[in-house]
């Protein structure tokens, strides 16, 4: 086994030196947003790059894909100039990905019939494709928050101490069905969706309230004209723009939705009598709001079968397929981006994602050369197999950075068991489990050395492997008695175990869980590992039925949606209390409220300024003092699979950032 690990390590080292430019250092966590300049101008600031006044012809003279040119010639589509906005988003070096991540960006060429093949393991959900399709309202390179520019929205202006935000839309921007995108789509979203108690009982989302707080003061929308609108807050909301970039994987649908379609299913515009037939088809009577929810496709829904034909502004649009297991996405003829030569993006015609049984089956498709791009289901544990099959499969394994902490133990501290709550809510118990983890063994055997100790999220002291200290802490908690198998009894004298259910969301989670179960025996903790279907895992988590799990975690500094994502796993009922403004769930203890208050203060301040950064450091200190979840490793490398023919594939930075720049991928020879 040691020999195999040594050989595998050599393979991974060779990968780093060859595919990653001689071992470039890992990209840092996205830097905080630069302070927003107090705007003085009365006109909209210009986009970072202007579209050519007259687009320069590409090398082959084509400014649109052959499949679209054929439709124009047949009279099935308007000419390209009529499909693009007056000022398209211009893509070139450093726009979607920084030049540090992609130093050799090149303008691509169309290939008629080009397809990106990928695979997914969850029914009606293709995560790699979702990320490729998701378009935020605003954008910054590398999924960061520095250098925020327009995206779906053309531009913005910030005034009055970060209280007034004016947004400028792209005149001539169209939905994928050819209808114009205007401020009516914004007004409808704000007033008729968020302002309707049936559709949104809690009203405006937290992201549109001061401090990103469900109880914060709401913003006020003002429509200026067909392409200009303003959102005003009663107090500073310095980091509001971050919520329009990519926080929480949100997309433009948080703010802009196709009113011309959705009004058909809304009783403010369509009498309920006209909805009766469709209500009956869906086994509904008067519940028009439920029907509306089924017709409304938000950014998370774009790969779901019910969204076939739904208008979007994404680069590819879901098409009908002969099999529900095969998802086909075809280029959007009205997509709003062009490259520096004037060619409409995306370069590639289609994405096809095939559903298979599980993550292992997804990886099997990689090895047999049936995948052109994959990130979501890869793992370092698979790298030796990837490297062995690269030539045969026609792909490269690109070692990039993971945007999350890849493996974290979440103890659901609100799981409905009094003894469990007593123990899991005591920081000594969480520290004991952390000390029992032999991280060196995990880093060597699972990550081949390409991971580090969780210095930010757990800290040096509590991530040290110290079985003696772990046992002492458990003794302090009254867990001094053991059963015949050497497992500790609970402080009540009854058998004690931790059921760790996981959905095998990534290849490394199951082997890590099994290794942890062995390591926990050294401190007398019965760590029971159970793999369940990933959809069932989500349902059990939502219902507060998971006692514990192993999953990835976002930035551990108590910040924005990342805190909420983690809170939903280490304190499900606390999370419900927060997101419902105290109407449901369980009120969290003071140490959790402290993080929520700091989170609100950070959102009110401007990212990158002194106050914001100081609060971030306080967040790390809070994390290390309380260890709300037990992060196993940080700074993990992430293998991404890309066809040897794909171009504009990054060599550094976050792997997932390549998904978000999928429209600039193209096939070379």
Pin down the residues of each PLM region:
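N-terminal lobe/hinge region of extracytoplasmic solute-binding protein
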Residues: 73, 78-160
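Gly/Pro-rich hinge or "lid" segments in bacterial periplasmic/extracellular proteins
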Residues: 119-144, 249-345, 466-475, 664-668
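Aromatic- and charge-enriched surface segment that lines or borders ligand/interaction sites
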Residues: 155-200, 230, 362-365, 423-425, ...
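Ligand-site clamp/hinge motif
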Residues: 170, 303-307, 334-385, 517, ...
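Extracellular/periplasmic solute-recognition and catalytic clefts
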Residues: 193, 197-206, 221-222, 317-328, ...
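Detector for C-terminal structural segments
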Residues: 310, 316, 320-327, 331, ...
């Amino acid at each position: 086994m040691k020999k195999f690990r040594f050989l595998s390590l050599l393979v991974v080292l060779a990968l780093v030196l060859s595919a990653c430019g001689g071992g470039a250092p890992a990209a840092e966590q996205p830097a905080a947003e630069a302070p927003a300049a107090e705007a003085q101008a009365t006109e909209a600031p210009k986009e970072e790059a202007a579209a050519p006044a007259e687009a320069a012809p590409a090398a082959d003279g084509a400014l649109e894909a052959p499949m679209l040119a054929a439709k124009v010639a047949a009279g099935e589509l308007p000419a390209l100039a009529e499909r693009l906005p007056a000022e398209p988003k211009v893509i070139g070096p450093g726009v979607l990905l920084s030049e540090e991540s992609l130093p050799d960006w090149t303008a691509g060429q169309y290939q008629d019939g080009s397809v990106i093949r990928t695979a997914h393991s969850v029914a009606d959900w293709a995560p790699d494709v979702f990320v490729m399709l998701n378009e935020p309202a605003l954008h910054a390179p590398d999924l960061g928050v520095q250098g925020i520019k327009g995206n779906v929205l053309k531009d913005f202006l910030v005034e009055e101490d970060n209280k007034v935000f004016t947004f400028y839309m792209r005149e001539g921007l169209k939905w994928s069905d050819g209808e114009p995108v205007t401020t009516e789509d914004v007004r409808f979203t704000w007033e008729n969706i968020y302002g309707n108690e049936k559709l949104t009982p809690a009203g405006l989302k937290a992201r549109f309230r001061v401090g990103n707080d469900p109880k914060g003061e709401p913003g006020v929308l003002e429509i200026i004209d067909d392409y200009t609108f303003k959102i005003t807050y009663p107090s500073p909301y310095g980091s509001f723009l971050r919520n329009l970039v990519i926080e929480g994987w949100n997309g433009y649908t948080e703010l802009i939705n196709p009113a011309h379609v959705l009004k058909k299913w809304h009783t403010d515009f369509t009498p309920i009598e006209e909805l009766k037939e469709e209500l009956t088809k869906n086994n509904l009577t008067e519940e028009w709001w439920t029907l509306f929810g089924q017709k409304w496709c938000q950014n998370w829904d774009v790969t779901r079968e019910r969204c076939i034909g739904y208008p979007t502004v994404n680069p590819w649009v879901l098409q009908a397929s002969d099999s529900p297991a095969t998802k086909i996405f075809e280029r959007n003829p009205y997509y709003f981006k062009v490259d520096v030569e004037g060619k409409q993006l995306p370069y590639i015609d289609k994405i096809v994602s095939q559903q298979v049984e599980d993550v292992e089956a997804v990886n099997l498709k990689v090895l047999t050369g049936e995948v052109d791009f994959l990130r979501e289901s890869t793992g370092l544990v698979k790298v030796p197999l990837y490297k062995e099959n690269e030539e045969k499969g026609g792909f490269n394994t690109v070692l990039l950075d993971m945007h999350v902490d890849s493996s974290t133990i979440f103890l659901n501290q609100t799981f409905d068991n009094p003894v469990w709550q007593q123990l899991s809510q005591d920081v000594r118990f969480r520290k004991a489990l952390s000390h029992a983890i032999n991280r060196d063994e995990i880093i060597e055997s699972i990550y081949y050395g390409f991971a580090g100790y969780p210095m930010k999220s757990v800290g040096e002291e509590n991530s040290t492997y110290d079985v003696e200290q772990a046992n002492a802490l458990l003794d302090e908690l009254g867990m001094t008695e053991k059963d015949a198998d050497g497992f500790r009894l609970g402080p009540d004298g009854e058998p004690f175990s931790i059921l760790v259910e996981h959905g095998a969301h990534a290849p490394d989670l199951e082997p890590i869980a099994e290794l942890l179960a062995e390591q926990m025996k050294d401190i007398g903790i019965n760590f029971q590992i159970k793999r369940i279907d990933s959809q069932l895992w989500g349902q059990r988590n939502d219902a507060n039925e998971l006692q514990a799990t192993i999953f990835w975690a976002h930035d551990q500094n108590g910040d924005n949606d990342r805190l909420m994502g983690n809170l939903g796993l280490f304190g499900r009922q606390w999370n419900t209390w927060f997101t419902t403004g105290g109407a449901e769930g369980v009120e969290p203890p003071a140490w959790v409220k402290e993080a929520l208050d700091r989170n609100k203060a950070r959102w009110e301040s401007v990212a990158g300024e002194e106050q914001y950064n100081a609060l971030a450091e306080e967040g790390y200190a809070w994390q290390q003092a309380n260890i709300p979840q037990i992060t196993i490793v940080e700074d993990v490398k992430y293998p991404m699979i890309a066809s040897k023919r794909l171009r504009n594939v990054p060599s550094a930075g976050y792997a997932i950032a390549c998904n978000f720049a999928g429209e600039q991928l193209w096939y070379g020879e």
